[in-house]
């Protein structure tokens, strides 16, 4: 006979206690008889009822003992039958274990392949980020070069404008120089004419001086002739005077002298008048020639000064023009070099972008292929799970039929139930959708090591349920079970404004916390945003990564509820997580309640989600 179970021992202890409680109290011996009160009557009735219950309990204990004896006999027969059926079940069990080992091997290979693909995807994403950073850096350098080219173009345009202004000034100065040269030519012509007139006047003066000298000589000659004639006349007079009377000689000498004096005075007056007129004419012509010559000299000197200044200005403008031309040529060469460099960089960037796009296309194709293979493996896994469940049911049926004890192997049951209802999509793009997703995880503990701990004489586990719903285009895609982040996703093909929207979190019946988006925040179509708590140590990088600086954790517990509320206070998305504990028996036969501990596992990710990583196979 097998020893009684702890449950039976407790049942046996309870009747003894009840019997002890039901023992009647002794009355007072030899006391006088008194009329019974209602309280006394009720106590007597209760004693009678307790006595009957004790009798029934004793009968029940006898019955239980008889049943235990019968049970021991049946257990002996079962043990005999087990020896017989063990040989029959060994073949099925070996086949089941081989298929189970194959399924485990396939799942392990799938997990390893998936981990390898995740590592490759991470490397490719890191390379893509580096390429994007390099492209952004090159784009910044290209923008700086384009700005430099624009500055040089503006400088070149200013140089062209200054060159055009200098050329116009040069043309104006050239016209001024031409006019000055024409005036100078006219002045030189006038100067030549004045010189010619001066030469003529000089010749005339010389001619007049010669004529004056000839007239003076002629006058001297005539004077000498006249004096000779006077002397001759005097000699004749003297000869006549010899004959004339001496009285008349004095009168005649006086008249002679008077006539000679008058003739001399008239001749002197004529010579003086002629000389004065000649001098006045010569002086007037000489003054006129000098004045004209002075004017011509002044005009020529002024023209020479203006010509000199024009030449100096022309030389200065020529120097400036040559400098501007050199600057313009240097700017053109620099612009040409920058354009060539920019064209080379543009071609290089275009080739790099084409190569990266080709690589990204190949990566997408590889990822799609790997996702397809992963989906096929998941389908195979689901099929294997179904077959394993079928084998398990068959084994359980055989065990029940043959009355065998179930094997203490760990098992995990994962059930998914999703239901979605989508409304009509109108021409304006309005999307009405509500979905609910429920995920349950149940993991009983066996005799071997498991996630929760180890045990040899009992079984236990935990139950984790997660529900999600969304009535709009934005859903709560993922939440961290350790309270590090909450992730939202825009499932539509249009941008969604999240201005003044709030994410609320309530753990058990505690205080509700809320994160509020900025008034201008917009979630792009098909994009996700992750709101991290400050204690996660993640850097703030909008618009995809936001940090809640005023909260160190989103909070966690046995159950918590996360809600997305729009600006009008309406709930548009919700996700709840509930964690329940299970009961297990220890070696002493006592039931203990154990709370399940869980971390951030990827049991809640959808099929094909690339965020999941290989954490080990918990299915088998």
Swiss-Prot record:
Residues 49-83 are annotated as: Coil 1A. Residues 46-402 form the IF rod domain. The modification N6-acetyllysine is found at residue 81. B-type lamins undergo a series of modifications, such as farnesylation and phosphorylation. Increased phosphorylation of the lamins occurs before envelope disintegration and probably plays a role in regulating lamin associations. Changing residue 157 to Y: In EPM9; disrupts fibrillar formation. Keywords: Acetylation, Coiled coil, Disease variant, Epilepsy, Glycoprotein, Intellectual disability, Intermediate filament, Isopeptide bond, Lipoprotein, Methylation, Neurodegeneration, Nucleus, Phosphoprotein, Prenylation, Primary microcephaly, Ubl conjugation. GO terms for biological process: heterochromatin formation; nuclear envelope organization; nuclear migration; nuclear pore localization; protein localization to nuclear envelope. Residues 588-601 have a biased composition (Acidic residues). Residues 609-620 have a biased composition (Polar residues). Residues 618-620 form a propeptide. The modification Omega-N-methylarginine is found at residue 433. Residues 401-620 are annotated as: Tail. Residues 462-579 form the LTD domain. GO terms for cellular component: intermediate filament; nuclear envelope; nuclear lamina; nuclear membrane. Residues 404-431, 444-453 have a biased composition (Low complexity). The modification Phosphoserine is found at residues 37, 316, 407, 420, 422, 424, 426, 497. The modification Cysteine methyl ester is found at residue 617. Residues 1-38, 399-464, 581-620 are annotated as: Disordered. Residues 257-400 are annotated as: Coil 2. Glycans are attached at residue 413. Residues 84-95 are annotated as: Linker 1. There is a cross-link at residues 77, 81, 195, 255, 489 (Glycyl lysine isopeptide (Lys-Gly) (interchain with G-Cter in SUMO2)). It is linked to Partial acquired lipodystrophy: A rare childhood disease characterized by loss of subcutaneous fat from the face and trunk. Fat deposition on the pelvic girdle and lower limbs is normal or excessive. Most frequently, onset between 5 and 15 years of age. Most affected subjects are females and some show no other abnormality, but many develop glomerulonephritis, diabetes mellitus, hyperlipidemia, and complement deficiency. Intellectual disability in some cases. APLD is a sporadic disorder of unknown etiology. Dimer. Lamin dimers then assemble into dimeric head-to-tail polymers. Ultimately, two head-to-tail polymers assemble laterally into a protofilament with a uniformly shaped rod of 3.5 nm in diameter. Interacts with TMEM43. This is Lamin-B2. It comes from Homo sapiens.
């Amino acid at each position: 006979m097998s020893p009684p179970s702890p449950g039976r021992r407790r049942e046996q202890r309870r009747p003894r206690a009840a019997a002890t409680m039901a023992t009647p109290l002794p009355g007072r011996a030899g006391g006088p008889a008194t009329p019974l009160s209602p309280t006394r009557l009720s106590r007597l009735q209760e004693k009678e009822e307790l006595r009957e219950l004790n009798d029934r309990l004793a009968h029940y204990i006898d019955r239980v003992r008889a049943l235990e004896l019968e049970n021991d006999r049946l257990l002996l027969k079962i043990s005999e039958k087990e020896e017989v059926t063990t040989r029959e079940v060994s073949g099925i069990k070996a086949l089941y274990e081989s298929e189970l080992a194959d399924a485990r091997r396939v799942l392990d290979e799938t997990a390893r392949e998936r981990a390898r693909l995740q590592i490759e995807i991470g490397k490719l994403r890191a390379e893509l980020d580096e390429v994007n950073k390099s492209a952004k850096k090159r784009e910044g350098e290209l923008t700086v070069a384009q700005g430099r080219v624009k500055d040089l173009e503006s400088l070149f345009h200013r140089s062209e404008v200054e060159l055009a202004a200098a050329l116009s000034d040069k043309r104006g100065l050239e016209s001024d120089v031409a006019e000055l040269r024409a005036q100078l030519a006219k002045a030189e012509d006038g100067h030549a004419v004045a010189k010619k007139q001066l030469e003529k006047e000089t010749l005339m003066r010389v001619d007049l001086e010669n004529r004056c000298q000839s007239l003076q000589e002629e006058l001297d000659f005539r004077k000498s002739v006249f004096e000779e004639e006077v002397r001759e006349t005097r000699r004749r007079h003297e000869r006549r005077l010899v004959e004339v009377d001496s009285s008349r000689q004095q009168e005649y000498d006086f008249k002679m002298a008077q006539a000679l004096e008058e003739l001399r005075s008239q001749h002197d007056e004529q010579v003086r008048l002629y000389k004065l007129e000649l001098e006045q004419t010569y002086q007037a012509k000489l003054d006129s020639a000098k004045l004209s010559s002075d004017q011509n000299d002044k005009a020529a000197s002024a023209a020479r000064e203006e010509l000199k200044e024009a030449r100096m200005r022309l030389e200065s403008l020529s120097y400036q023009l040559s400098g501007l031309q050199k600057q313009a040529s240097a700017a053109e060469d620099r612009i040409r070099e920058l354009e060539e460099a920019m064209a080379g960089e543009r071609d290089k960037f275009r080739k790099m972008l084409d190569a990266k796009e080709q690589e990204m296309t190949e990566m997408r194709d590889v990822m799609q292929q790997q996702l397809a293979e992963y989906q096929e493996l998941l389908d195979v896994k689901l099929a294997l799970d179904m077959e394993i469940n079928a084998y398990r049911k068959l084994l359980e049926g055989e065990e029940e039929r043959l009355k065998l004890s179930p094997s203490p192997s760990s098992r995990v049951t994962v059930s998914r139930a999703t239901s979605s209802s989508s409304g009509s999509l109108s021409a304006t793009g309005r999307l009405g959708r509500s979905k609910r997703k429920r995920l349950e995880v149940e993991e009983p503990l066996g005799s071997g090591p498991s996630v929760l701990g180890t045990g040899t004489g009992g079984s236990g586990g935990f139950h984790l349920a997660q529900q999600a719903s969304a009535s709009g285009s934005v859903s709560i895609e993922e939440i961290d079970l350790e309270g590090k982040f909450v992730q939202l996703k825009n499932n539509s093909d249009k941008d969604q404004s999240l201005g003044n929207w709030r994410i609320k979190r309530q753990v058990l019946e505690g205080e509700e916390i809320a994160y509020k988006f900025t008034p201008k925040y917009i979630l792009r179509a098909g994009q996700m945003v992750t709101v991290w708590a400050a204690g996660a140590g993640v850097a703030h990088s909008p618009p995809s990564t936001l940090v809640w600086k005023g909260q160190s954790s989103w909070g966690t517990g046995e159950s918590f509820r996360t809600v997305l509320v729009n600006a009008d206070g309406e709930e548009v998305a919700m996700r709840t997580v509930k964690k329940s504990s299970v009961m297990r028996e220890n070696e002493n036969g006592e039931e203990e309640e154990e709370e399940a501990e869980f971390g951030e596992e990827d049991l809640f990710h959808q099929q094909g989600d690339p965020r999941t990583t290989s954490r080990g196979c918990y299915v088998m």
